[in-house]
Design a protein with these regions (language model features):
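Phosphate/pyrophosphate-binding loops at sites that engage ATP/ADP/AMP, CoA/4′-phosphopantetheine
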Residues: 55-69
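Electropositive phosphate-/nucleotide-binding environments in soluble metabolic enzymes
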Residues: 2, 6, 46-53, 77-81, ...
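Short glycine/threonine-rich loop-to-helix capping motif typified by GTGT followed
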Residues: 41-47, 77-99, 128, 165-173
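Active-site-proximal alpha-helical scaffold in enzymes
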Residues: 11-18, 125-146
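Generic secondary-structure signature for well-ordered alpha-helical cores
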Residues: 17-20, 34, 61, 65, ...
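Hydrophobic alpha-helical bundle architecture
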Residues: 66-74, 97, 101, 116-125, ...
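Condensing-enzyme catalytic core mediating Claisen C-C bond formation in acyl metabolism
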Residues: 1-58, 104-118, 122, 150-156, ...
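Extended hydrophobic packing segments that form well-structured cores
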Residues: 139-140, 145-146, 151-166, 170-178
Length: 178
């Protein structure tokens, strides 16, 4: 077995009516968005702009929330630049500002911006199953199941995945009742 590539995850979807009878706290899909921007690197007009802006805007609008409302964020982190471009695209900070915005420990455990609270793909499981594990960690955070890494009072989470060569983006906003 290989820590870098082995593993898996699952998410079970059901109706709100059935979820009320489950043993675990239900987590609701509040909004989602998707974008595909290019089919090859040579077709990218600007390497600093990703489809996260479109997928994020759709997800936030459908959920009726803004980036400022989010308690915990899970993003696909294939490379450091992927994280920076995603945070900018989703609207957590301005274009070209991500590296300064996270400086000083903002995203470290206990920082004021809970990001990739499981450690992220660069720390424990890129590539392979990490996409689904973004959702799994977001759900666990919202249920209060994360022990030492638990974000206090987390009610809203964003999970964002990228595919291809930063060409495909999917964003989901999840939430729980207070």
């Amino acid at each position: 077995s290989c820590l870098v590539t082995d593993g898996g995850g699952a998410v079970v979807l059901t109706s709100a009516e059935r979820a009320r009878d489950l043993r675990r706290r239900p987590v609701e899909v509040l909004g989602y968005g998707e974008r595909t921007t290019n089919t090859s690197m040579t077709a990218v007009p600007d390497l600093t702009v990703t489809g996260a802006a479109g997928s994020g805007a759709d997800a936030f609008a459908r959920a009726g929330v803004t980036p400022a409302d989010i308690d915990v964020v899970q993003v696909y982190d294939s490379f450091t630049i992927t994280v920076a471009l995603t945070l900018e695209g989703l609207g957590f900070c301005g274009r070209g500002e991500a590296l300064d915005w996270i400086a000083g420990g903002r995203i470290r455990p206990g920082g004021d911006f809970p990001l990739n609270t499981s450690g992220g793909g660069l720390s424990y499981c890129h590539p392979g199953q990490f996409g689904i594990l973004l959702l799994v960690e977001a759900v666990r955070q919202l249920r209060g199941e994360c022990g030492d890494r638990q974000v206090p009072d987390a009610r809203l989470a964003v999970a964002h995945g990228t595919g291809g060569i930063l060409s495909t983006h999917a964003t989901v906003v999840l939430g729980v009742d207070a």
